[in-house]
C-alpha cells in the first residue's frame, strides 16, 4: 500500500514537471522566454559550463570565434561590474556572412535559457543613420531608448559612417562610464528623451549611462580601424575583440547540409513533399559561398530552391505528394518528382525584371 502511494506520488510529481515544462514551451512559443528554456537541465542553470559546445551545435565552422564570444559574455561574471557601467565592451569583426550576428544571437539565447541573461532581446542601433550634427537629437533619443530597452545587450552597426561627435559620446560610455549631455533633457511619459529648453525642470537628464548593458560593436574591420575612429582610450576600454575566420571546405559542406535539412523540413511542412538530395547537391550549395555574401549565399540558394519548387506546385491546382529529388548537373540544379525525367529547377522562377 505504501509502495502504491509512493508510486502515485512519483507519477504526480512527473505530471507536474511535464505541465511546468509545457507552460515554459508555451511561453517560448509566445516569445516571452528564450527558445530552449524548457529543455535546460537544472545543473546548467546559472552556469557557463558546456555553453560554447552548445552554441557550436548550430553555429558551424567558427569554433574559435564562438569560444571568444562566450568568453566575452562571461567576462563580467568573473571580473564583476560597478554600478551602471557597461558590463563589457566587445568588438565582433570579420568578413560578411561569416556568422558574426548568428553566433551572438545563439549565445544570448542559450545564456537566457540558462538564466544568465534576463532575456535574449537585443537593441540595435545603426550608426549610419547619424552622419552629421543635424541628427544629434535623433541619435540621443535612439541611444537613450536602446540603453533603457528590455534586454541586456545593445548592438552598434556601421560605426564607420557615424558623425565623430556621436562616437565621442559612445567612447565616454565605455571609458568613463557615462556621457554628459550638452543640453538639458527630460524623459516624457512615453520614455522618450526630449529637450527641456531653458527652464529648470525636475527630473532633468544631464548624462547618459550604459545601464549595465553589454555594448557590442559589429564591423568588417579590426582593432586598428576602431582606434582610427574612436581613439586609443576607447580601444583600451574594449574588453574583447572577437574575429571570425574564413570557412574551410569542410565547414561549408556542414553548413550546406544544415541548410538543406532545414529546407527539407520547410518543403515537407509547406508543400507536402519529401525532399531528397545527394552529396553533389550539398557541394553545389556549398559553392555558393562568395567573398561578398559569405555563407549567406548558401541560405539564398536554398531560398531560390524553395521558391522554384513552390512555383512548380502553383502550376497545378491538384495537391502534389511524394518525393522530389534534387540533382546537380553541369548546367545547374535539376529536380524530378516521383521518378519523372529530371528538369531544370531554376527555369521555374519568373524572369528577373530588367527594366526593359
Question: Model segments located where?
Answer:
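C-terminal engagement/docking regions of AAA+ P-loop ATPases
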Residues: 26, 30, 79-82, 96-105, ...
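Conserved C-terminal "switch" segment of AAA+ ATPases
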Residues: 34-44, 58-59, 113-119, 148, ...
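Pre-Walker A (pre-P-loop) alpha-helix and adjacent loop at the N terminus of AAA/AAA+ ATPase modules
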Residues: 45-88, 307-314
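A short helix-loop-helix "switch/interaction" segment in the helical subdomain of ASCE P-loop NTPases
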Residues: 56-60, 98, 161, 280-300
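Walker A/P-loop
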Residues: 82-120
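AAA+/SF3 P-loop NTPase mechanochemical coupling elements
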Residues: 86-88, 148, 182-220
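Conserved AAA+/SF3 P-loop NTPase catalytic/coupling segment centered on the Walker-B
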Residues: 104, 136, 148-192, 226-237, ...
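Short glycine-rich substrate-engagement loop in P-loop NTPases that contacts/grips substrate
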Residues: 119-150
Amino acid at each position: 500500500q505504501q509502495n502504491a502511494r509512493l508510486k502515485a506520488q512519483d507519477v504526480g510529481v512527473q505530471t507536474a514537471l511535464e505541465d511546468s515544462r509545457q507552460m515554459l514551451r508555451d511561453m517560448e512559443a509566445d516569445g516571452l522566454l528564450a527558445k530552449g528554456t524548457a529543455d535546460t537541465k537544472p545543473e546548467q542553470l546559472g552556469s557557463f559550463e558546456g555553453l560554447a559546445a552548445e552554441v557550436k551545435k548550430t553555429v558551424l565552422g567558427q569554433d574559435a570565434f564562438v569560444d571568444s564570444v562566450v568568453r566575452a559574455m562571461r567576462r563580467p561574471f568573473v571580473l564583476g561590474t560597478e554600478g551602471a557601467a557597461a558590463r563589457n565592451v566587445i568588438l565582433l569583426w570579420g568578413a560578411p556572412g561569416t556568422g558574426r550576428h548568428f553566433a551572438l544571437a545563439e549565445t544570448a539565447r542559450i545564456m537566457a535559457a540558462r538564466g544568465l541573461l534576463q532575456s535574449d532581446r537585443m537593441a540595435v542601433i545603426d550608426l549610419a543613420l547619424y552622419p552629421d550634427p543635424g541628427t544629434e537629437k535623433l541619435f540621443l533619443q535612439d541611444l537613450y531608448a536602446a540603453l533603457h530597452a528590455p534586454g541586456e545587450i545593445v548592438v552598434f552597426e556601421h560605426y564607420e559612417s557615424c558623425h565623430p561627435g556621436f562616437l565621442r559620446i559612445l567612447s565616454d560610455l565605455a571609458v568613463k562610464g557615462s556621457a554628459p549631455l550638452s543640453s538639458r533633457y527630460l524623459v516624457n511619459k512615453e520614455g522618450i528623451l526630449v529637450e527641456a529648453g531653458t527652464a529648470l525642470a525636475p527630473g532633468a537628464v544631464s548624462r547618459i549611462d550604459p545601464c549595465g548593458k553589454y555594448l557590442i560593436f559589429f564591423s568588417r574591420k579590426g582593432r586598428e580601424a576602431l582606434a582610427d575612429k574612436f581613439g586609443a582610450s576607447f580601444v583600451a576600454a574594449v574588453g574583447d575583440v572577437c574575429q571570425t575566420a574564413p570557412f574551410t571546405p569542410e565547414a561549408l559542406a556542414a553548413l550546406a547540409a544544415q541548410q538543406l535539412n532545414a529546407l527539407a523540413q520547410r518543403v515537407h511542412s509547406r508543400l507536402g513533399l519529401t525532399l531528397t538530395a545527394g552529396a553533389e547537391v550539398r557541394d553545389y550549395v556549398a559553392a555558393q559561398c562568395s567573398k561578398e555574401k559569405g555563407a549567406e549565399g548558401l541560405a539564398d540558394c536554398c531560398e531560390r530552391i524553395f521558391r522554384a519548387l513552390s512555383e512548380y506546385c502553383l502550376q497545378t491546382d491538384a495537391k502534389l505528394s511524394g518525393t522530389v529529388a534534387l540533382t546537380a548537373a553541369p548546367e545547374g540544379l535539376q529536380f524530378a518528382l516521383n521518378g519523372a525525367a529530371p528538369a531544370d529547377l531554376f527555369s521555374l522562377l519568373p524572369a528577373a525584371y530588367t527594366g526593359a
